Amino acid sequence: MNKDIPVNKKYLANKILTELRYNKRYMYNWVRWFGNTDKDSLKIREYLEAEIENVNYEIKDSRFDVENCFIDAVPLFKKISRSEHGLNKKNDDNPRKQEKNVISFTSENKINGEIEYNYFLLSDLKIMILGAIWVEVIGRELDNGQLSNDVYANRVSENTSSIFKPYFEAYSDFRDASFKEVKTLIENNRTGILVQTDLSKCFYSINIKELEDKIKKLLTASEVGENVIRLNDYVFSVLGKYNDLQTVKEYVEKLSSQKDQKILPIGFFPSNVLINIYLKELD
């Protein structure tokens, strides 16, 4: 693992802009980050490169102040969940009428059911840059050294144009590998079952302290320098501040009564790597 924090501001700016381009959930952050800049893409890139340089210096000089950075959680629409009562009504015998996420926008219709949200990180640009640097310096090494080829989601990209491997590529690789395994079983006259499912709300069921201890042990074993240790501490300070938000606390309490349950902020680059490390034993 890197002993220090080597950052190429041009490459990193390009990667961040690629993530912003293809993930529409960053639209709230875009206005906050670049609303005071000219719409010219070159000026935005120059501004981003300058901020990357500033954040890198602040990390190395122990001047990065998470507490003075803006961090919030913004709810983004996920789906409308209809109640069991609503689903069991006689008028809902038709399967098409039972579809939870199809909404008819007519004046006589009321939306019955609970609106569900995913909470997304809204922050200063410095927080996003901090996360991008963490992925480049620490996350990449964790991805390469700790995760097997059987893990497909949220893998750190090997190229210079994006932070993570595009979702559609990762899904295609997962699908192809799964069907290849099934084909092999059939050719060998064996029986197998292919189960495809989601880990519901896995980002919302995290023991952050346990995860932090695990990452620190890996960094210590790699004998990284003080700057890398400090970078990791800053990232976990961001996680702490996010989970201290009243909105997030109330949301976690609503989900579960477990004392140590916390959230990895969706939209924070390190979360994508950390969730894979956290679920490593499950994989």
Please provide the spans of the model-predicted regions.
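Non-catalytic, polymerase-adjacent accessory regions of viral genome-replication enzymes
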Residues: M1-K110, E114
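Generic detection of long, well-ordered alpha-helical segments
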Residues: D38-E49, D124, M128-G131, F168, ...
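Hydrophobic, Leu/Ile/Phe/Ala-enriched alpha-helical segments that form helix-helix packing faces
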Residues: L48-I59, R63, V137-L142, V182, ...
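Charged, glycine/proline-rich intrinsically disordered loops and linkers
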Residues: G86-I111, N159-A177, L239-S257
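Catalytic micro-motifs at enzyme active sites that drive phosphoryl/nucleotidyl and oxygen chemistry
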Residues: F105-N109, Y117-S123, D176-E187
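Conserved pre-motif C helix in the palm subdomain of viral-like polymerases
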Residues: E114-V151, S200-F203, Q258-D283
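Active-site-proximal segment of RNA-dependent polymerases
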Residues: G131, V135-N207
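Conserved polymerase palm-domain catalytic core
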Residues: V182-D283
